Amino acid sequence: MAAPRVTLDTDMPRSVAVTYDYLCPFARNAHEAVVAALRDGSDLEVRFVPFSLEQAHVEEGQPPVWETPVEQLRRGVRALSYGLAVRDEFPESFFDFHLAAFAARHDHGQKFETDVLDDVVASVGLDVEAVRKVVETGRPLEALAAEHTEAVDRWSVFGVPTFIDGDEAVFIRFMERGRVDDLERALDLLGWNRLNEFKRTTIPR
């Protein structure tokens, strides 16, 4: 007896959330594709969700990274705090900041000290003092705490980038940067929950 033909539902979701941490090159690959798709006119609604890899490696019983005073933040958390300040208070500049922050780390090898992030802010035409004031309010850290915690508690997120569609959450590694076609193919598969893991045994060089 022939096996039943498998037909995939290739209707892409119309609304997704996607996690990020500026420290991760694979998050960069995915987010460049997401931003490119949106700038090309995609009607996909995207919620950009911060997820701290530094928090994910905090030992049990230790205080969470967002409880550190603003001036003593770990570098990755500091970058997320700046990104959230821009996302929530200067949304028209978020895409530019988002891509520039990834570039600062992964093209130029910069560590996310305050002066580096100030330069990223200035490079996208934002007022450095205005963004810094938002960071200093602590609101971005509150947003990070809430959104990271929800990602872990509700969807069991463990890394970036994770794409979330309804109750489904899938960790995806794109090997190339900014490929909208790769993004579309991955989004097509989000709802196919009978495929749980599909991992290559070697990394293409």
Question: Could you say what each language-model-derived stretch is?
Answer:
Residues D21, P69, L73, V134, ...:
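Charge-dense, low-complexity intrinsically disordered segments
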Residues R28-D115, A186-L189, N193, E197-T201, ...:
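Structural alpha/beta surface segment adjacent to cysteine/selenocysteine redox centers
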